[in-house]
Amino acid sequence: MAYSDFTLSDLEEKFGVTNQRKALNFQSKAIEPTQWLKKELLDSKEMPIKSEKARSEWIVVPILKELRNLNVKFFTIYSGDNLVGDKEKGLQGECDFILSKDTKSYDISVPIFHIVEAKRNDLEEGIRQCSAQLVGAKKYNEKKGIKMDKLFGCTTTGDVWQFIEFSDQLYIDNNKYYLSEVDNLLGVFQSIIDYYKSTLK
């Protein structure tokens, strides 16, 4: 079993993790993208983005690089890495993107955010997979003696982004954010990063 095999019902039955849809209401302020990011995203519109790989290269990675530079490399980015949360229970598998607190480690140190590219542009499938990865990330951190009250993730088609908060249960955001309003998207990411800056020392 792998992260992509889990349903939300599986997470509740196997781990007692329930889920709820609600507006997460991020206390965020829009962030004007740099000229570099504007050009990257403008260039992406001219490309035939037909696959998850193309989407990550032309859309997701530039946004993550922008955020990393804005935050003086507070986090590092792992792409396509395997994260084992609980092998016996199937919480394992390749992750599209993991943001981890930057400790200069070659391995994933403290996973704090997961991004799942929605296969076949199916956000619901992405929500399920991302939710399983967040449960796995919590198990991974606990094995290292790291307790975190909240973890965040999102799934994206490139054009549409939907966020998840994992605390006492999974909270799936009713709101969606759009690449066409990238300043608002950057603001949501920044509010999450600011939360981690205040809780991770």
Q: What does each model-identified segment do?
A:
Residues 155-201:
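Short terminal or interdomain "cap/linker" segment that borders an active site or interface and mediates
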Residues 90-94, 109-113, 128:
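Short connector loops at helix/strand junctions that flank enzyme active sites
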Residues 121-172:
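Nucleic-acid nuclease catalytic cores
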Residues 104-110, 144-148:
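Short, solvent-exposed loop/turn segments that connect beta-strands within catalytic domains
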Residues 59, 95-102, 111-120, 133:
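Conserved catalytic cores of phosphodiester-cleaving nucleases, focusing on short active-site segments
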Residues 43-49, 83-86, 117-122:
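A short glycine/serine-rich beta->alpha loop
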Residues 1-65, 198-201:
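Charged, often low-complexity linker/regulatory segments
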Residues 74-105:
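Active-site metal-binding core of divalent-cation-utilizing nuclease and nuclease-like domains
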